[in-house]
Amino acid sequence: GPVGRNTGEVIGVFGTLDWQEAKRANLSTLIGGQSSGITQVSFASSVDVHNLRKIESHLQKLQSPVWPQDILGSIDQQRASRGESIFNEYCVSCHARIDRADPDRRIIANMSRVSDVGTDPRMSENSINAQGYSGILRNQYVGLEVGDILLDRKAPVAALLTKATLNVVATPDPDKWFFQRWTDWIVDITKAFFHNEIKSSIKQGNYDPDTTASPLASLNAYKARSLNGIWATAPYLHNGSVPTLYDLLLPKKCEGDPEDGEYRPDQFQVGSREFDPAKVGLKSSGYKGSTFDTSLKGNSNAGHEYASGKTAQLNGKVLKPLTKDEKLDLLEYLKTL
């Protein structure tokens, strides 16, 4: 659930972990799925699970930002109306339209194989193939979708992170005084394991299912998010390789393409806070910033070229390329989301 997701993010970014052999099994090791009869591990960490849960609770009350017409200019309603029809044909099968004001909404997100959508595969490949030393976690079991795997001397990083996240959530905060520590822990455990309104469900879309031979195969796919507030989230694609929404509607220049065509930039500047309301994104040239080079591994700006007639829809159909005017119509509609 949300608590596990946020805990995993903190561990992956800047959390400090102090894993030590525990003297004996306890309630935390039991909840964390640690096997009896082997070395028990204490998962003390700098992760404040209680605060993460409170932050998540506050985030549930937020709504996506609305295009500020008094600052960035009025939306052309006629263009936006035409763009809505294009969105319905080209986009909505993956990117569900939602009501930003409805806190009880449920979103069915569709998965797309990296090979199908054509975007840079490095992140998904790393999530599946990255290995790390298990240390004192060796010989622990980790429960995955298709069953338990036994951690060897080297094990998939995704499995190690899963084990660490579950046990960090299950461990009381050692920095708090006794009463506060256990009060917060009981509340957090109850909320994390029993009050999660979003239940686990089968993934939807096109992806390779996990199997006993490849227990992390489904990670080789990206999830299509709803596009509410998309105008405010530049740069685009999962690796930030496309600076503006307008550029996202263009194809990547490939060998043999005409030189006078309009393509996604292979290099652009990042670091500006100046917004470009015409292309919908942050200013990406004309200043001294850091250069984003799409030729580097992990930085490719290819793929997701539906508007250019190069990427197939979920049903396998490739739609015709949009004209310049149709792209501007779609861009105008995206401002309204």
Regions found by a protein language model. Give the residues of each.
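Periplasmic c-type cytochrome electron-transfer domains
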Residues: G1-L337
